[in-house]
Amino acid sequence: MQGGKKAGESIKETATNIGASAKAGMEKTKATVQEKAERMTARDPVQKELATQKKEAKMNQAELDKQAARQHNTAAKQSATTAGHMGHGHHTTGTGTGTATYSTTGEYGQPMGAHQTSAMPGHGTGQPTGHVTEGVVGSHPIGTNRGPGGTATAHNTRAGGKPNDYGYGTGGT
């Protein structure tokens, strides 16, 4: 029975990954077409360069969204298959303690707090840092937001997504 569940979760993960890749491909194509249109109508070389930069930013965001969806799909598969291995009387608490395979610190290595932000055990325990306005996403020039270790970090503006978009949701009805 467990083998069938694992196979089903793998198929589901593969299907949602294909959907995420297709969506990213469409976003990249849209960015390229929009860039070409803007370059054709622009007379100033600066405007043409700006159109190219906008295209590259959109393409990078599409790739980041695809990678985030893949990570989400992998985590969902692991969560579903792990839940099947638990016997009666066992449960997870979601306390956030133990070994983490993901970052448990906020920007620049600051702890993010002890509030669980996901219903799935082991999926982060952080809160946003700084002032947060509901429904507003901050804007940062690409490559200037440096995270721990000097690596560039990205913000997935589509986290959670729309229920009917590819790569998101539980797969149920």
From Swiss-Prot:
One of its GO terms (biological process) is embryo development ending in seed dormancy. Residues 92-106 have a biased composition (Low complexity). Residues 1-173 are annotated as: Disordered. One of its GO terms (molecular function) is oligosaccharide binding. It holds the Pfam family LEA_1. Coiled coil: none annotated. Residues 70-79 have a biased composition (Polar residues). InterPro entries: LEA_1. Transmembrane segments: none annotated. Residues 1-12, 25-68 have a biased composition (Basic and acidic residues). Belongs to the LEA type 1 family. This is 18 kDa seed maturation protein. It comes from Glycine max. The lineage of its organism: Eukaryota, Viridiplantae, Streptophyta, Embryophyta, Tracheophyta.
